[in-house]
């Protein structure tokens, strides 16, 4: 089973104490140990860089970016076909954000069914299943 890693997973691990921190850490440990086949996208990496640079935390931007690149052997590019599909998802999926629509489109276009995320918005996307984080 291949799992798409959303930006909030490594960001919870790197962040302040939070109820999602330990489940996120356990998941990333499984990825690092190759018990989970993980992938992500260039858009996820962009989100990480954007978030931490906007906070003035370039150290964390680099650290979290490097972690994701290290443990995700596949980083999917975002293409015109993906943004076209994201546009379509926005019109048929109530309440989905543009960012989540791009992630979902990349996943669907690469036949990745599972996502590791704490974002319940993905539950509304047909063809996407959110991994339970425990």
Predicted feature residues:
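Internal alpha/beta domain cores that form substrate/cofactor-binding pockets in large enzymes
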Residues: 65-68, 78, 93, 123-134
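Conserved glycosyltransferase catalytic-site signature
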Residues: 7, 42, 100-104
């Amino acid at each position: 089973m291949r799992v798409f890693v959303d930006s909030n997973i490594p960001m919870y691990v790197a962040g302040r104490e939070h109820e999602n921190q330990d489940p996120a850490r356990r998941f990333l440990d499984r990825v690092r140990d190759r018990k989970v086949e993980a992938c992500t996208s260039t858009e996820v990496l962009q989100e990480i860089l954007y978030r931490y640079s906007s906070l003035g935390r370039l150290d964390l931007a680099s650290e979290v970016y490097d972690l994701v690149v290290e443990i995700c052997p596949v980083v999917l590019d975002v293409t015109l076909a993906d943004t076209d599909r994201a546009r379509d998802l926005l019109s048929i999926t109530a309440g989905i954000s543009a960012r989540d629509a791009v992630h979902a489109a990349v996943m669907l276009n690469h036949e990745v069914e599972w996502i590791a995320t704490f974002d319940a918005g993905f539950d509304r996307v047909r063809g996407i299943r959110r991994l339970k984080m425990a």
